[in-house]
């Protein structure tokens, strides 16, 4: 196919997302009531997990994305274990329209990081003497929308 003057039409360069690095930025696991917390329990513990995503531009087309995973397990009002993980990646993103850049950084990049963070948490909990904690998959689209709605509501609040 040609553009009318005998030359093929110009195509826009294809979008690219490259993972330059992945790393544990910060990690903590606490088992404050051991060895008592390791005894068999009649009921499963109550487990609470929080997920947050942050990003910063570190070079012209490079973004550091930090996936924060924090959680704790409690049984009968006592803390069994807690963990905090900041797992990060540096991503190079080129040929992406500006209006698509923020969602790409805040949805797709953490989606790529999540399986690695999940493995770190599962291994740490297992190594702490408990059954591995297998985190459920995260809907990063919903998380992104919730954060955008929260930011919009905060901006509408009178100062």
From Swiss-Prot:
Subcellular location per UniProt equals: Cytoplasm
Keyword Nuclease: yes or no? no
Q: Report the sequence similarity comment from the record.
A: Belongs to the SecB family.
Mind telling me which HAMAP family this protein's record contains?
Answer: SecB
What does the record give as the function of this protein?
Answer: One of the proteins required for the normal export of preproteins out of the cell cytoplasm. It is a molecular chaperone that binds to a subset of precursor proteins, maintaining them in a translocation-competent state. It also specifically binds to its receptor SecA.
Record-level GO BP terms: protein folding; protein tetramerization; protein transport
The answer to whether UniProt assigns keyword Electron transport to this entry is no
Gene Ontology terms: cellular component: cytoplasm
Q: What is the protein's given name?
A: Protein-export protein SecB
A Pfam family found in this protein is: SecB
């Amino acid at each position: 196919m040609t553009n009318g003057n005998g030359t093929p039409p110009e195509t826009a360069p294809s979008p690219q997302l490259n993972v330059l690095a992945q790393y544990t930025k910060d990690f903590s696991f606490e088992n404050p009531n051991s060895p008592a917390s390791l005894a068999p329990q009649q009921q499963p513990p109550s487990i609470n997990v929080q997920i947050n995503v942050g990003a910063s531009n570190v070079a012209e087309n490079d973004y550091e994305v930090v996936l924060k995973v924090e959680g704790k397990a409690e049984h009968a009002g006592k803390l069994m274990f807690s963990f905090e993980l900041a797992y990060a990646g540096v991503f190079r993103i080129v040929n992406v329209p500006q209006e698509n850049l923020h969602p790409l950084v805040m949805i797709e990049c953490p989606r790529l990081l999540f399986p690695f963070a999940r493995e770190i948490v599962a291994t740490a909990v297992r190594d702490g003497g408990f059954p591995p904690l297998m985190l459920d998959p995260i809907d990063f689209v919903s998380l992104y929308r919730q954060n955008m709605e929260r930011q919009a509501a905060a901006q509408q609040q009178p100062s």
